Amino acid sequence: MKDRYILAVESSCDETSVAILKNDKELLANIIASQVESHKRFGGVVPEVASRHHVEVVTTCFEDALQEAGIVASDLDAVAVTYGPGLVGALLVGMAAAKAFAWANKLPLIPVNHMAGHLMAARDVKELQYPLLALLVSGGHTELVYVSEPGDYKIVGETRDDAVGEAYDKVGRVMGLTYPAGREIDQLAHKGQDTYHFPRAMIKEDHLEFSFSGLKSAFINLHHNAEQKGEALVLEDLCASFQAAVLDILLAKTQKALLKHPVKTLVVAGGVAANQGLRERLATDISPDIDVVIPPLRLCGDNAGMIALAAAIEFEKENFASLKLNAKPSLAFESL
């Protein structure tokens, strides 16, 4: 039987990535051109800068992916691309490249939801058992998603305000940490103690919605008041206290979701899934009867490998798009 190859493109934010998947599960290449250094001085992603960088490197990413995979364009069976959610300018660069490549090589185009990509990155670990529940945590999203079968997604809980990754970056900026701050806060938290009191919004309420704006504001106020009074704060304890509050909220809502939606598998994915503290709490707090599946670190951040793994599901369903496909920066799971 002929091998099947899918080329995938991801450009929803500040990573330009092209990957090649063989036979639905083997990643032969996952080229990632990061822009982190370009955005550090701004303390966050600047959309116009991100779009320009995508334009500069996307062609090279295509070439490098094919070379690393050891195949040529004529070996491919489909092209997949992230069409939302994300920054509209950034999405359009990747989509233009993917559509042009698909047209030139007479290949079908597979539209992929960026968050479905994060979720399906777990397929790199093992074949997933359905139905399952997913906790998706990133810089732009915090969602609990019920997946009844491959490709069938339903959001059952989400943040009312800030995404968890966004909260990490904002408090990191207040402390003078380098963007993105999540990894450094996690490392500092492991050296400190939970000594400062921060709120755990809606942690006892029965619904599955999150809120991190109150926690962020409490952190900023504590830091500001200490500065005004000339009081010293222990950075490690500050990070430990902030992270403890975040993880208490995430774990409480996830456990409630598991009671409301009994499943045997929990996927935890997205950039924040790389957080060591979160991984430790999942190991201790989630019932051993639940199979917790977390993508490897290399697939937690934005990358085209996860888009390819999600695209394999859509390929089986023959969910192809025309070359008129447009970017949907606010795309939700329900509209997939």
UniProtKB/Swiss-Prot annotation:
Localization per Swiss-Prot or TrEMBL: Cytoplasm
An example Gene Ontology biological process: tRNA threonylcarbamoyladenosine modification
Presence of the UniProt keyword Nucleotide-binding in the record: no
Amino-acid positions noted as binding substrate in the UniProt annotation, renumbered to this chain: 136-140, 169, 182, 186, 275
Positions annotated to bind Fe cation: 114, 118, 302
This protein's UniProt keywords: Acyltransferase, Cytoplasm, Iron, Metal-binding, Transferase, tRNA processing
Keyword Metal-binding among UniProt keywords: yes
E.C. designation(s): 2.3.1.234
GO cellular component, one term: cytoplasm
Catalytic activity: L-threonylcarbamoyladenylate + adenosine(37) in tRNA = N(6)-L-threonylcarbamoyladenosine(37) in tRNA + AMP + H(+)
Gene Ontology MF term list: iron ion binding; N(6)-L-threonylcarbamoyladenine synthase activity
Co-factor note (free text): Binds 1 Fe(2+) ion per subunit.
Major site of localization recorded for this protein: cytoplasm
Co-factor requirement: Fe(2+)
Similarity-based family: Belongs to the KAE1 / TsaD family.
Role summary: Required for the formation of a threonylcarbamoyl group on adenosine at position 37 (t(6)A37) in tRNAs that read codons beginning with adenine. Is involved in the transfer of the threonylcarbamoyl moiety of threonylcarbamoyl-AMP (TC-AMP) to the N6 group of A37, together with TsaE and TsaB. TsaD likely plays a direct catalytic role in this reaction.
Name of the protein described by the UniProt record: tRNA N6-adenosine threonylcarbamoyltransferase
Gene giving rise to this polypeptide: tsaD
